[in-house]
């Protein structure tokens, strides 16, 4: 039970969301898809209002001197907004994850068991900066039959208010109750949200490791943690340098403020002398600050010396740490010690090295000969994602529709009783799968 005032405004919001979600859970796929189309259209119509709200957020954030990586995530230009709207449309085209029959089994003649997917209920999503996350999450929640309570960071309040206003306007002309999507905007509401175990079924915090731990320690609601992205790229001794250089540049500099950009480059000692000067030139052309261990400094004497803190830091900026390793085993040991189990990649032409890396690196996303920036629900074909889970238990990696449903067992009989199947003359079950 929650312990704070039953008259709390947030309680009332959560109750409305729960009620709306219970009706959404049984809506047809067609009705949900119509709602998603309406959301995309409403966002398109409100494009100018949303972009102006974001400009106001960015101006206020700039005046307050927020960190550069956070500012980059906050910015929502026309290109980002268009991509987010396309993502909504893509979610509408995906298969409905609700109502899937996972098990269809005859236990005995006339006694049939089914396991069928169903919505979780109400999601509580806490995120900072990225206002387009509200768009992605709302579309996924509706397609998966869930209500959602969004809690944005203070720096993105104006943007998210404009976005959620448009979403609710779109839903108002559909079978989906606009109360399905709610927005919270104050820090105090975060703590209140974490107490709503009676009304919220899953909390997804998107932020630092310390923030995710804070959430986990202050709620009885299950938590799906989206934490730091300390991602690594390992350049193996059998790497093709013509691939390794552009992949490194893309993984670091294409968009350094996101969680799937690399923070540490590990280089096999046998290829370091040839590879490092080339990649350093390419990275420095993109204004990336390089920090290296002692062995790296012998090859690149003009870069900054790396410290122990660098190996465990998510810069989310144009900074990259470099370490030379003696073997693939050393690279894997470094990744498993300092990484965040988000995304790590190997560049090599040796299949044995790939097999070793894939088998021993304990991360949600493990890549070969491609950029870590591909670790994304949209790029995986999920339409969008509510976050990237770095926990060991599923769902893991980019969490799309399939990660937002659970299942229930349904059994139909015809007067069957357990006594028939117990005792000395117990009847045997047939246990025959029907699908």
From Swiss-Prot:
Gene Ontology MF term list: glutamate-5-semialdehyde dehydrogenase activity; NADP binding
Top EC class for this record: oxidoreductase
Major localization class: cytoplasm
Pfam family, one: Aldedh
GO cellular component: cytoplasm
Signal peptide range: none
UniProt keyword Repeat present: no
Gene Ontology terms: biological process: L-proline biosynthetic process
InterPro entries xref list: Ald_DH/histidinol_DH, Ald_DH_C, Ald_DH_N, Aldehyde_DH_dom, G-glutamylP_reductase_CS, Glu-5-SA_DH, GPR_dom
Known function: Catalyzes the NADPH-dependent reduction of L-glutamate 5-phosphate into L-glutamate 5-semialdehyde and phosphate. The product spontaneously undergoes cyclization to form 1-pyrroline-5-carboxylate.
PANTHER family registered for this protein in UniProt: DELTA-1-PYRROLINE-5-CARBOXYLATE SYNTHASE, GLUTAMATE SEMIALDEHYDE DEHYDROGENASE
Protein name: Gamma-glutamyl phosphate reductase
Gene: proA
